[in-house]
Amino acid sequence: MKLAKKAFLLASTMTLVASCGTQSSKEFSSVRLSGAGASFPAKIYTRWFKDLANEGGPKVNYQAVGSGSGRKAFIDETVNFGASDDPMKDKDIAKVTRGLVQIPMVGGTIAFGYNYDCDLKLSQEQAVQVAMGKINNWKELGCPAGKLTWVHRSDGSGTTKAFTNSMEAFSTTWTLGTGKSVKWPSGVGAKGNSGVAGVIQNTPGAIGYVNQSYIKGDVKAAALQNLSGEYVKPTVEAG
């Protein structure tokens, strides 16, 4: 996939919606809906659902439990809708007895977020080596010497799938495979984008992968080298 070879890492989110009937506007405002899934779009979903309620729409409770858990909750019919960073496959769709509509919702960039006193620029090969746990000192990245701690997702995650797809495209030295979860050889695991960002925020010397919207405070975004040799930070414009 050509997009995976750009300097920024891309992810998108699908919403899984059960078939439903029509209701009057008065009934609609009293509806309570529950959803669960990807943490990648959680911030924009929270904003949208707040605006929806303020405009007389239904009250929506969304839990950012990760794509894998959200899909399971939707299949098990414990929520009204789910959110996943990639579409459901036929074998999972067959398990949904109430009907299913998959709607593309949002796209965004995944950043290498880090907490260290350094203007970090990563080549694609360096990015792969960091994620594989091959680099454990900031000096190897042209920064002042210090312990480097890799932070990754511990739950089934569409963000992880998009991230590992890009790592595989970046270099043939990537050997961890791709998917919502992989066997990380080292590092600290955390649930959700917020969990990973929290560990980075509280751990000087930490680096991991997060949705661009979690880049704030002590969590800075690394610039990643593209195929033209330029170092690019993830932004709305770049994505």
Q: For the regions a protein language model found, what residue spans apply to each?
A:
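Short, low-complexity disordered leader/linker segments with a strong preference
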Residues: 1-32
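Exported/periplasmic ABC-transporter solute-binding proteins
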Residues: 20-96, 100-239
